[in-house]
Amino acid sequence: MNLQRFPRYPLTFGPTPIQPLKRLSAHLGGKVELFAKREDCNSGLAFGGNKTRKLEYLIPEALEGGYDTLVSIGGIQSNQTRQVAAVAAHLGLKCVLVQENWVNYSDAVYDRVGNIEMSRIMGADVRLDSAGFDIGIRPSWEQAMDDVRKRGGKPFPIPAGCSEHPLGGLGFVGFAEEVRQQEAELGFKFDYIVVCSVTGSTQAGMVVGFAADGRADKVIGIDASAKPEQTRAQILRIAQHTAELVDLGRNITERDVVLDTRYGGPEYGLPNEGTLEAIRLCARQEAMLTDPVYEGKSMHGMIDMVRNGEFPAGSRVLYAHLGGVPALNAYSFIFRNG
């Protein structure tokens, strides 16, 4: 496998820490050891997160090509767009963000706090759009790029989650290689890796990266899109493409993609009671905050699987904390009593 042939622009601090979740593990019976790899602490650029790791492989093209404006898209409380705005500010580039109405959640402050607030503070041109949720290529995003061109700019396209970009899976191939180095220091290997999946490239990169040592199907994606078949197909497609890019040496098949569909409801961006319980439990046991859109759902999945005995006794499970905590501010009414 050859990831090193791709240029990488450093936007992160370096290897993200792996934290043992001792109190949460004990609370859930102590038969399974839980750990978290803290991608939520990976950068000083506006709280970072998993997209910052991905952007390290996209940004060289933007800089070398003389692009002057990063153009991206997401929901109103998109972590992706906040991280793109941060990278643009860091590099002295312009930034246009399309923020679509992906979540059926009504709160007077929803479009004024959290991620979108930070993007505005960092100087991004934030454009609200009424279109609903979808993980594919969006007309509003293409229109934003046309607008930049008409003004004489040169837009660099960054799709939702970086996932439709040809290099969108590379960052989390690097994640897997980083985990292997840390496992050598820890003296053991993780039996399972749990990760939230929506647009697909995070899990796709992990599948390829862990396929190198036979653990592709030990990456357990927790769907948070509530459109799991579309997400599953996108993970597989991105993983197959990424495997070719890095010369994995074997094909990625449907068997390699594990996507648990039990925890994504009621729909994208809306937490269920299990999501909220998981957010509170993790916060009160470990002071590790998760959000109602993504990490609260993957945390719910991992907790539920431990409680149900779905991980064999003695398993070591690595939870990939992808970030997203700024979105908590947009759901303050739900947590008004804690």
Swiss-Prot record:
GO terms for biological process: 1-aminocyclopropane-1-carboxylate metabolic process; amine catabolic process. Its cofactor is pyridoxal 5'-phosphate. The active site is at 78 (nucleophile). It catalyses: 1-aminocyclopropane-1-carboxylate + H2O = 2-oxobutanoate + NH4(+). GO terms for molecular function: 1-aminocyclopropane-1-carboxylate deaminase activity; D-cysteine desulfhydrase activity; pyridoxal phosphate binding. The modification N6-(pyridoxal phosphate)lysine is found at residue 51. Its EC number is 3.5.99.7. Keywords: Hydrolase, Pyridoxal phosphate. Catalyzes a cyclopropane ring-opening reaction, the irreversible conversion of 1-aminocyclopropane-1-carboxylate (ACC) to ammonia and alpha-ketobutyrate. Allows growth on ACC as a nitrogen source. HAMAP family: ACC_deaminase (MF_00807). Homotrimer. Belongs to the ACC deaminase/D-cysteine desulfhydrase family. This is 1-aminocyclopropane-1-carboxylate deaminase. It comes from Ralstonia pickettii (strain 12J). The gene is acdS.
